Swiss-Prot record:
This is 1-deoxy-D-xylulose 5-phosphate reductoisomerase. Keywords: Isoprene biosynthesis, Manganese, Metal-binding, NADP, Oxidoreductase. The lineage of its organism: Bacteria, Bacillati, Bacillota, Clostridia, Eubacteriales. The gene is dxr. GO terms for molecular function: 1-deoxy-D-xylulose-5-phosphate reductoisomerase activity; manganese ion binding; NADPH binding. It comes from the Bacteria. It catalyses: 2-C-methyl-D-erythritol 4-phosphate + NADP(+) = 1-deoxy-D-xylulose 5-phosphate + NADPH + H(+). It holds the Pfam family DXPR_C. One of its GO terms (biological process) is isopentenyl diphosphate biosynthetic process, methylerythritol 4-phosphate pathway involved in terpenoid biosynthetic process.
């Protein structure tokens, strides 16, 4: 069980829920980072009293320093600030809940400082999964998944031999537009896409869930986290979001993890593993459950999932290009610069233009990330 934590991305959805869990569990918070929401960060500082905080830029750091005069708290900014947050000497676990590839370098930095990782930033493994897992093994660092699906798989694998696993089954809600055709999707607005039927999440991941890119990123994450081949990872649409994922074994047995669709549950487990602690979260009532149904994902209509599979098949830097293009396209959609279906179109065009490096180092991945963002922006303009 974690005793002292640092959090990068403390003002986002996962960060806020992590602090709630830490408060309930009596876990000390050593350091926090946020991008621009310094009003909320200030409130978090007053409540949790970290030693160090970091914000997105120097102007925000100056404002934060003025607000926190007399508290004896070190205020930092940028990537260097996030590095200082994750390397805090007292913290034994770092919760990485920033959105996108902004979490990659701080996560690797934390691993190299031998901090256990509660991983909510799936883009870290999407873009640099092999490097991250090799670093974790070399530094004897444990990576605990925070995503509900990967937390479920983690639990379903416990006590079983890896060679006896036949396949991992990732469940997906199907998002708010399940069953719609491409023509109907063309007119979807950001407001409509931000209404997820089951989960309460941040804007970017909610759009990713609507396009099914989130599930595609989770497939790539699962490949590295659980060291599985692509053909042993299946996606099933499960609209009720009660079964969070499953593992099928060679004898035909299937182990599933069920629970209410509440992110606080996997967050708490990532902090307390191998223990389970009491809480006041809603418990699953089987007598009130709707019928549990399953269907194949429509990868022709929701092309992002197909593109994610393709990027993993190609390998190398292609997943990094896919991820970066997606981040730019989603941001453009949220700002009404492109339509819903143009998210996938933009990603596909970036992938078609990318010259893949099959054996990249970290610097190569960062370079591709920058290239893909620039290319996506040019396509959108």
């Amino acid at each position: 069980m974690a005793k002292i934590i640092s959090i990068i991305g403390s003002t986002g959805s996962i960060g806020r829920q992590t602090l709630e869990a830490a408060k309930n569990l009596g876990i000390k918070v050593a350091a926090l980072s946020a991008n621009s929401n310094i009003d909320l960060l200030e409130k978090q500082v007053h409540e949790f009293k970290p030693d160090v905080v970091s914000v997105g830029n120097s102007e925000l750091a100056k404002e934060m320093s003025n607000r926190l005069q007399g508290f004896g708290i070190e205020v930092l900014w940028g990537q260097d600030g996030m590095k200082r947050v994750v390397e805090h000497s007292e913290a034994d676990t770092v919760v990485t809940s920033v959105v996108g590839t902004a979490g990659l370098i701080p996560t690797i930095h934390a691993i190299r400082h031998k901090k256990n990782i509660a991983l909510a930033n799936k883009e870290t493994l999407v873009t640099a999964g092999q490097l991250v897992m090799e670093d974790a093994k070399k530094n004897n660092v444990k990576i605990f998944p925070v995503d509900s699906e990967h937390s479920a798989i983690y639990q379903c694998l416990l006590g079983n031999k890896d060679k006896q696993v036949e396949k991992i089954i990732l469940t997906a809600s199907g998002g708010p537009f399940r069953g719609k055709n491409i023509k109907e999707l063309k007119n979807i607005t950001p407001a409509q896409a931000l209404k997820h039927p089951n989960w309460s999440m941040g804007n970017k991941i909610t759009i990713d869930s609507a396009t099914l890119m989130n599930k595609g990123l989770e497939v790539i994450e699962a490949k590295w986290l659980f060291q599985r081949d692509l053909d042993s990872i299946q996606v099933l649409v499960h609209p009720q979001s009660i079964i969070h994922s499953m593992v099928q074994y060679v004898d035909g047995s299937v182990m599933a993890q069920l629970g209410s669709p509440d992110m606080r549950i996997p967050i708490q487990l990532a902090l307390t593993y191998p223990d389970r602690c009491q809480n006041n979260f809603n418990k699953l009532d089987f007598l009130k459950c709707p019928p549990l149904t399953f269907e194949e994902p429509d990868i022709d209509t929701f092309k992002c999932l197909r593109l994610a599979y393709k990027s993993l098949e190609i390998g190398g830097t292609m997943p990094a290009a896919l991820n970066a293009a997606n981040e730019i396209a989603v941001a453009a959609f949220l700002e009404n610069h492109i339509g819903f279906t143009e998210i996938a179109e933009t990603i596909e065009q970036v992938m078609q233009r990318h010259n893949v490096n099959i054996c990249p180092c970290l610097e190569d991945i960062i370079e591709v990330d920058c290239w893909a963002r620039t290319t996506a922006r040019q396509l959108i303009i």
